[in-house]
Amino acid sequence: MAAALLARASGPARRALCPRAWRQLHTIYQSVELPETHQMLLQTCRDFAEKELFPIAAQVDKEHLFPAAQVKKMGGLGLLAMDVPEELGGAGLDYLAYAIAMEEISRGCASTGVIMSVNNSLYLGPILKFGSKEQKQAWVTPFTSGDKIGCFALSEPGNGSDAGAASTTARAEGDSWVLNGTKAWITNAWEASAAVVFASTDRALQNKGISAFLVPMPTPGLTLGKKEDKLGIRGSSTANLIFEDCRIPKDSILGEPGMGFKIAMQTLDMGRIGIASQALGIAQTALDCAVNYAENRMAFGAPLTKLQVIQFKLADMALALESARLLTWRAAMLKDNKKPFIKEAAMAKLAASEAATAISHQAIQILGGMGYVTEMPAERHYRDARITEIYEGTSEIQRLVIAGHLLRSYRS
């Protein structure tokens, strides 16, 4: 599948309906910094995004439309299972490749980017790392082609950042586990065919009593809540999962009982690289939009880009974007080289998400009134960017993670 993904790079370049900026402005990082295979991957994903995602992104947002046809095509390219070994149906690529692909896909459509991120990082990621051979065959391979996608159920109505305070329970009963409780803010909920679900198997042990389970969807005892009407990323569904005596087989536990909190935290560490990359894609397309508009908008007899105040804004936007990209790539490469990357992933996610919000905010300012109307994509980029500072660990949580690692290094 990796070969199929890379082969697409040799096709002709395709232009999207919006900006010449798509191809002209985004050239900073595609030459000597990347191996040839990663450059080919970048071009493949960019071509796909131009042809398949950019033209539908506004409709996806406006109509809360799940991009089913595009997700299926992404599965055929290996984009939904990028670091899954080829023998399990994946692309067999590394996390740097995943970061590059996530950015390009998210540039085309942020909703599609998060759908891709959840399936890769949050659903397949923990099964690959902690699952048995049998679980990988049953719960990974069917989710690589785009026919099925998964979701990740950790947060609850009463806890988000406090992941160890799970009130959802799982009790052993004969040859089954019985789940009760509600999981909240679940991305891909309405389209998912399976979920990694975290529940307490021993409340007395607090976070050491949390376990992870593989749950098919739909299944008796599991009800979906309403689709949330969100500010951004409106093409991905978000809903509660409600468990009422939901019975699953005993072998549905992922890892060992009590390993759930560890599995969740390690999964989020990986996922933050994906969300950082999504934020980079949003930031890049917002910058492209701002530059393209400023180059063509005349004021005082010259393009806006002749004004120093606009030049300074664009310089600050580019600085924030490039800095965040380097942090993201570093985190991905550390993971690929099996080195500690928790602090670096937190830094990447923090820098990229805050850059995306700031850059999309400034893009609206540069466009002025045109930035405030849906005729232009700038307002959508701003709405899409905001969630990247919240999900998979808020900016405040990232700062706690970074500070904790920093202080431990000084005290050791």
Swiss-Prot record:
Consequence of substituting residue 353 to L: In ACADSD; loss of acyl-CoA dehydrogenase activity
Annotated signal peptide: none
Required cofactor names: FAD
Residues holding substrate: 161, 269-272, 393
Localization in the cell: Mitochondrion matrix
Effect recorded for residue 192 to V: In ACADSD; loss of acyl-CoA dehydrogenase activity
Sequence positions that bind FAD: 152-161, 185-187, 297, 308, 365-369, 394-396
Keywords noted in UniProt: Acetylation, Disease variant, FAD, Fatty acid metabolism, Flavoprotein, Lipid metabolism, Mitochondrion, Oxidoreductase, Phosphoprotein, Transit peptide
GO cellular component: mitochondrial matrix; mitochondrion; nucleus
Reaction catalysed by this enzyme: a short-chain 2,3-saturated fatty acyl-CoA + oxidized [electron-transfer flavoprotein] + H(+) = a short-chain (2E)-enoyl-CoA + reduced [electron-transfer flavoprotein]; butanoyl-CoA + oxidized [electron-transfer flavoprotein] + H(+) = (2E)-butenoyl-CoA + reduced [electron-transfer flavoprotein]; pentanoyl-CoA + oxidized [electron-transfer flavoprotein] + H(+) = (2E)-pentenoyl-CoA + reduced [electron-transfer flavoprotein]; hexanoyl-CoA + oxidized [electron-transfer flavoprotein] + H(+) = (2E)-hexenoyl-CoA + reduced [electron-transfer flavoprotein]
Active site: 392
Modified residues (N6-succinyllysine): 51, 129, 262, 306
Positions bearing Phosphothreonine: 27
InterPro entries: Acyl-CoA_DH_CS, Acyl-CoA_Oxase/DH_mid-dom, Acyl-CoA_Oxase/DH_mid-dom_sf, AcylCo_DH-like_C, AcylCo_DH/oxidase_C, AcylCoA_DH/ox_N, AcylCoA_DH/ox_N_sf, AcylCoA_DH/oxidase_NM_dom_sf
GO molecular function: acyl-CoA dehydrogenase activity; flavin adenine dinucleotide binding; short-chain fatty acyl-CoA dehydrogenase activity
Pathway where this protein functions: Lipid metabolism; mitochondrial fatty acid beta-oxidation
N6-acetyllysine modification, residue list: 51, 72, 129, 208, 262, 306
Biological process terms in GO annotation: butyrate catabolic process; fatty acid beta-oxidation; fatty acid beta-oxidation using acyl-CoA dehydrogenase
The record's free-text note on cofactor binding: Binds 1 FAD per subunit.
Effect caused by changing residue 171 to W: 69% of wild-type acyl-CoA dehydrogenase activity; confers susceptibility to ethylmalonicaciduria
Segment annotated as transit peptide: 1-24
Family membership: Belongs to the acyl-CoA dehydrogenase family.
Quaternary structure, from the entry: Homotetramer.
Job of this protein: Short-chain specific acyl-CoA dehydrogenase is one of the acyl-CoA dehydrogenases that catalyze the first step of mitochondrial fatty acid beta-oxidation, an aerobic process breaking down fatty acids into acetyl-CoA and allowing the production of energy from fats.
Disease annotated for this entry: Acyl-CoA dehydrogenase short-chain deficiency: An inborn error of mitochondrial fatty acid beta-oxidation resulting in acute acidosis and muscle weakness in infants, and a form of lipid-storage myopathy in adults.
Name of this chain's protein: Short-chain specific acyl-CoA dehydrogenase, mitochondrial
Source organism per UniProt: Homo sapiens (Human)
Source taxonomy: Eukaryota, Metazoa, Chordata, Craniata, Vertebrata
